[in-house]
Amino acid sequence: MDEREALIKAGEIARQVKKEVVDLIKPGAKLYDIAEFVERRIVELGGKPAFPCNLSINEIAAHYTPYKGDGTVLKEGDYLKLDIGVHVDGYIADTAVTFRVGMEEDELMEAAREALENAIATVRAGVMIRDVARAIEETIRGKGFNPIVNLSGHKVERYKLHAGVSVPNVYREADTYVLQEGDVFAIEPFATTGAGQVIEVPPALIFMYLRDRPVRMLQARRLLMHIKKNYKTLPFAYRWLQDFLPEGQLKLALAQLEKAGAIYAYPILREVRGGMVAQFEHTVIVEKEGAYITT
């Protein structure tokens, strides 16, 4: 399977899981059950999770994934952002959709969805990133909402979810990267009723391996080896490690590894004013005359 075939296969799996999960999104549903279903189906369909299933509600914009024992349930009217990642041999599909639990799509969701459509319509080889960002910003502001300025889409490479080039939600003169044929990008507009900025809040429930570092605690060394072997350079969930070590030891080991610079912790991201947040996302392959949507 070549790179393009793997990217397309990952996208097909992500699309299928998005379809299947709809039936679970209802008042009273547990986030834990939804995340476990999503990740299990990814594997059953022939892929692997490229990152933990993100389930972020209302003013939480990103990086919430449930843990074992998490009792969080969906309530009618919640804005649920479902962000899923699939990889096939390291080639990634990253896609997100917002649900209004028990209700129809509203104007906030429409703004984010249309921003994604308009952004993708600008994508082709030779276009600057800032022109894609402009389409996102103009669409969201035109609908009376704010784009989130400190969240962005990103270039994707094999086993690298964030490959060094961002696709912001707002136009910036300095974003002069020119899209190349064959580039893979995840484009993800975030629209909010709030101020248009996110802040980090504890706890971190998602982590990523950075590098080997000496640590004193034996369990921390064992944990780092386990992380490297199983997740390579892709993000992983606290939940995925809860059976590996007892709770107290796991928290201590993760804290040591983070302090040593061996792993990176992704804090939960919340809209600064508590505004509602909607997000839609596709992964695209840049082509001469447009974009091939894999998801």
Curated annotation (Swiss-Prot):
- According to the record, how does the cofactor bind? Binds 2 divalent metal cations per subunit. Has a high-affinity and a low affinity metal-binding site. The true nature of the physiological cofactor is under debate. The enzyme is active with cobalt, zinc, manganese or divalent iron ions. Most likely, methionine aminopeptidases function as mononuclear Fe(2+)-metalloproteases under physiological conditions, and the catalytically relevant metal-binding site has been assigned to the histidine-containing high-affinity site.
List, in alphabetical order, the Gene Ontology terms for molecular function in this entry: aminopeptidase activity; initiator methionyl aminopeptidase activity; metal ion binding; metalloaminopeptidase activity; metalloexopeptidase activity
Sequence positions that bind substrate: H63, H162
**Annotated a divalent metal cation 1 binding sites:** D83, D94, E281
Cofactors, names only: Co(2+); Zn(2+); Mn(2+); Fe(2+)
Protein EC: 3.4.11.18
Q: Which GO terms describe its cellular component?
A: cytoplasm
Cite the InterPro entries for this sequence: Creatinase/aminopeptidase-like (IPR036005), Met_Aminopeptidase_Type2 (IPR050247), MetAP_archaeal (IPR028595), Pept_M24 (IPR000994), Pept_M24_MAP (IPR001714), Pept_M24A_MAP2 (IPR002468), Pept_M24A_MAP2_BS (IPR018349), WH-like_DNA-bd_sf (IPR036388)
One Pfam family of this chain: Peptidase_M24
Give the keywords, sorted.
Answer: Aminopeptidase, Hydrolase, Metal-binding, Protease
Q: What is the reaction catalyzed?
A: Release of N-terminal amino acids, preferentially methionine, from peptides and arylamides
Tell me the domain of life: Archaea
The entry marks the following residues as binding a divalent metal cation 2, namely D94, H154, E188, E281
User: Self-association or partners: how does it assemble?
Assistant: Monomer.
Role played: Removes the N-terminal methionine from nascent proteins. The N-terminal methionine is often cleaved when the second residue in the primary sequence is small and uncharged (Met-Ala-, Cys, Gly, Pro, Ser, Thr, or Val).
Q: Which NCBIfam families match?
A: met_pdase_II (TIGR00501)
The protein, known as: Methionine aminopeptidase
Native species of this protein?
Thermococcus kodakarensis (strain ATCC BAA-918 / JCM 12380 / KOD1)
Gene behind this chain? map
